[in-house]
Structures are given as C-alpha cells and as structure tokens.
C-alpha cells in the first residue's frame, strides 16, 4: 500500500474496514468484562459499570495520542521528511509515557473519591478500586501500544492493530474465567481477575506491536540523536492531542 500513489477510494477501503473491525472487537472487550462481572455478584457488576467512566480517562488519552501521532507522522511522510517522521515517532513514545504516568498517579489517588461522588457503597467502592488500581498500574502498556502503532497507522497499516485487537479479545475471553474463578494452581481473584486479564491482554498487544515496529525499515535509521528531546515536537504533539483528550473526558 502506497498512501502517496494508490487510488483514494481503494485506500479508504483498505484503511477503514480493518480499523472498523478493530473498533468492534474493542467494544466487545468491555461487553465480555461486564458479562463476567455479573457472574461474580451484583456488587461486582455495579463496581465495574462505575469503573468505566474512570477507565475512560485512559481510553481518551489513547485516542488523543493516536490522532496526534498518526496525523503528525502521516503529514511528515507526505512531505517526504524522514527526519520529522522519526522525530515525531520517538517524541510520541516519550509523550505517551509521560501521559501514562500522569494518568496513573491521578487514577490511583482520586479513584476512590470519584466512586464516592457517584454514590457508591463501601463494598462497591472497594470492588471498583480492586479493578481500577490494576488498570492504572498498567496504563503505560495501554498508551504505549497506540504510541508505537501510530507509525504503522500513519504508513497505512491498520491490519496489524486490527489483528492484535482480535487476538487480545480472545485472550481476554480465555483469561477472564480462569483468573476470576481460579483454575488448578491459579487462585480465584474475583473482580481483580478481570483487571489482571485486561492487563495481560494489553501486555500481549504491546509485545506484538513492538515486534512489528522493530521490523519496520524506518526504525533501522533511528540514531541516538532522535532520542534527544526537542520542544517543538512536544509542543505540536500536545496541541494535537490535548483538545481531543479534554473533549472526550
């Protein structure tokens, strides 16, 4: 696929269809988690339902990073400026790490208060924190996946991320009952198991995307100079991503 030369209607099909399928499986991900939470107890289901608005902070950040990384790297590819392509790629990774640390600190410190503001009982709050704390500890994997994928997406490769979402979805289905109810030497974790299953699935996604990116021809041109932070790239990424993150939140 050549984004600069191929027929536009064909490009739209090649890009949009895999992305749409990936989004479908991402939505099914949450439906599966909700189903298994209902198998634990009504309180666990309530806790998970009230966790989603908090968890959505990570989703919003991921979308913001995706849009910023894809658009800025894509524009640089269109300009045939390989220096900017690699600079934006390294800076979007650094930016993603910084955002994930900020989100983790916020979530771990304020999730309990958010549950209380939503009128949750002590039991629902405690169950919700068991889930959200795991998610926030692993937020770096959620955001790093989309940071790395921004290069692939900008090049027109939406199939890799689609395939990763599908595989992680089925991995999540397998892990959920094992970690929630226990199996052989694995203890029953309850609602915490849903968080652990999600985290393992995201770690799996991160490893697959990382391997794919490391095989990319552009990565061979990376030198230590591209890892020296430059304000202009951070500024452009910030102003591309932050309005999206704020509007979604």
What positions do the PLM features span?
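Transmembrane alpha-helix boundary and packing residues in multipass membrane permease domains
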Residues: 19, 23, 34-35, 71, ...
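Transmembrane helix-bundle signature of multi-pass secondary active exporters and lipid flippases
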Residues: 19-71, 135-142, 235-249
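Helix-loop interface residues and adjacent transmembrane-helix termini in multi-pass membrane transporters
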Residues: 28-31, 39-42, 76-79, 154-155, ...
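Alpha-helical transmembrane segments of multi-pass membrane transporters/permeases
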Residues: 96, 152-178, 192-195, 199
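Cytoplasmic helix-loop-helix junction between adjacent transmembrane helices
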Residues: 120-121, 125-128, 132, 139-166
